[in-house]
């Protein structure tokens, strides 16, 4: 399902991709894409692209750990994050096999506590996703133990039906801009 649907979404979103690319490049110096090192299936590292929403000199830590994260946003960054359009380039990662459409969100390489807890519960064996059960149940504001609990619940219930439910809930949350902190 990932290859077919991910490829179709990548093609259909082409014009939007170009528009976002241009908006990032025209509103702030630096590349349009930001590549972050993420933890994938079996704890292997991979590069995950997003449209750049933060200034080039932003420290490489999770946004919620920054002091005054808003001061690092680019002029278009808040809009891209609120609409989740910054995630659009991850369709390339789905096509490459680094990501699934649905699965636990990949941890940053330096989120040792999240990686350790996921490994303890076996969640590391899943291909990470663009969206997941934890994201539709809280997105940015979840504490790590609760996030891993949702990841574990997803692992136990994983099916096409559950994935489709998560995709629909994700679209609803994005349209309502629920759970976006920065």
Enumerate the predicted regions with their spans.
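A hydrophobic, helix-centered structural microdomain
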Residues: 1-56, 93, 160, 165-182
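Glycosyltransferase donor-binding loop in the core domain
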Residues: 11, 80-83, 125
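Conserved catalytic core of Hanks-type protein kinase domains
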Residues: 25-26, 82, 94, 138
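Short, glycine-rich, amphipathic interfacial segments at transmembrane boundaries or analogous
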Residues: 32-72, 130-149
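Short, well-ordered beta-strand elements within core beta-sheets of diverse protein domains
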Residues: 76-83, 152-156
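Short acidic-aromatic low-complexity motifs
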Residues: 81-91
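Hydrophobic structural segments characteristic of membrane proteins
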Residues: 89-182
């Amino acid at each position: 399902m990932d290859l077919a649907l991910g490829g179709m979404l990548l093609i259909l979103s082409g014009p939007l991709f170009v528009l976002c690319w241009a908006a990032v490049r025209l509103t702030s110096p630096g590349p349009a894409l930001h590549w972050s090192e993420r933890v994938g299936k079996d704890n292997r590292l991979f590069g995950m692209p997003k449209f750049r929403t933060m200034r080039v000199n932003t420290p490489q830590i999770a946004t919620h750990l920054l002091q005054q994260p808003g001061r690092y946003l680019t002029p278009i960054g808040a809009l891209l994050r609120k609409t989740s359009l910054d995630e659009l380039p991850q369709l390339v990662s789905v096509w490459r096999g680094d990501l699934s459409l649905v699965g636990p969100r990949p941890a940053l390489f330096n989120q040792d506590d999240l990686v350790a807890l996921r490994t303890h519960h076996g969640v590391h064996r899943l291909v990470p996703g663009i969206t997941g059960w934890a994201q539709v149940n809280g997105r940015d504001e979840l504490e790590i133990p609760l996030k891993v609990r949702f990841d574990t619940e997803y692992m136990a219930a994983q099916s096409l039906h559950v994935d489709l439910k998560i995709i629909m809930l994700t679209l609803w949350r994005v349209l309502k801009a629920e759970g976006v902190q920065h």
